Amino acid sequence: MKKLKLHGFNNLTKSLSFCIYDICYAKTAEERDGYIAYIDELYNANRLTEILTETCSIIGANILNIARQDYEPQGASVTILVSEEPVDPKLIDQTEHPGPLPETVVAHLDKSHICVHTYPESHPEGGLCTFRADIEVSTCGVISPLKALNYLIHQLESDIVTIDYRVRGFTRDINGMKHFIDHEINSIQNFMSDDMKSLYDMVDVNVYQENIFHTKMLLKEFDLKHYMFHTRPEELTAEERKVITDLLWKEMREIYYGRNIPAV
């Protein structure tokens, strides 16, 4: 897309929202409580603040204020207010390609708000536990929050991810013409690294004329030992392993498709 000469500030709002899910099976009530306590501590308000602070560096944001809170019995939230200084559009990379991974993050430039809320929960009887993190990165100006996508998914180990990206409002060029988007995008997947795309089955639902983009991701490989909490698969009978595998896989598909699947 040809670079635009704008009349004043870039008034477009770009919002990236996504849910990240981690799934686990805990055999006993004590193990379920242990998983909830473990995941609640792993992603407490301080850890989330560190992750979002790095996110600010990726999208080029100046932090104005940080509000964080751990909740009882579980859960946490962090909201960071950020500002954008005038940036020379010639210095901004608007091409459609993956953002940096955690080990390659560097600070540059400067951006509206970034927030995260966590929701640990468990099935009352079935041993299934899920951890959900809701994240929103919303910016005003020339820099896309999609640049933070790679980093956030890598930081929050994810079995299932649902992502929404939307560009709202309009900005004017020097001739007064309105522009409702200022960068090319065909799919959110184009902002992911090849190694990430190789790990997930993905599907897009995009409404191009409304500048709305949606991608769902489901981890391809299933290894039972990665989903057991304080129990090794070899400690179970073959029948128990099959029952637990079926439960986990059904749970993951229901979350991925957003609907309950009847038992066969």
From Swiss-Prot:
Catalyzes the decarboxylation of S-adenosylmethionine to S-adenosylmethioninamine (dcAdoMet), the propylamine donor required for the synthesis of the polyamines spermine and spermidine from the diamine putrescine. Belongs to the prokaryotic AdoMetDC family. Type 2 subfamily. Keywords: Autocatalytic cleavage, Decarboxylase, Lyase, Polyamine biosynthesis, Pyruvate, S-adenosyl-L-methionine, Schiff base, Spermidine biosynthesis, Zymogen. Pfam families: AdoMet_dc. The active site is at S112, H117, C140. The record marks K111, S112 as: Cleavage (non-hydrolytic). One of its GO terms (molecular function) is adenosylmethionine decarboxylase activity. PANTHER family: S-ADENOSYLMETHIONINE DECARBOXYLASE PROENZYME. It is an enzyme of class 4 (lyase). Pathway: Amine and polyamine biosynthesis; S-adenosylmethioninamine biosynthesis; S-adenosylmethioninamine from S-adenosyl-L-methionine: step 1/1. Its EC number is 4.1.1.50. Heterooctamer of four alpha and four beta chains arranged as a tetramer of alpha/beta heterodimers. It catalyses: S-adenosyl-L-methionine + H(+) = S-adenosyl 3-(methylsulfanyl)propylamine + CO2. The lineage of its organism: Bacteria, Pseudomonadati, Pseudomonadota, Gammaproteobacteria, Enterobacterales. This is S-adenosylmethionine decarboxylase proenzyme. It comes from the Bacteria. GO terms for cellular component: cytosol. Gene3D superfamilies: S-adenosylmethionine decarboxylase (3.60.90.10). Its cofactor is pyruvate. InterPro entries: AdoMetDC_fam_prok, S-AdoMet_deCO2ase_bac, S-AdoMet_deCO2ase_core. Is synthesized initially as an inactive proenzyme. Formation of the active enzyme involves a self-maturation process in which the active site pyruvoyl group is generated from an internal serine residue via an autocatalytic post-translational modification. Two non-identical subunits are generated from the proenzyme in this reaction, and the pyruvate is formed at the N-terminus of the alpha chain, which is derived from the carboxyl end of the proenzyme. GO terms for biological process: spermidine biosynthetic process.
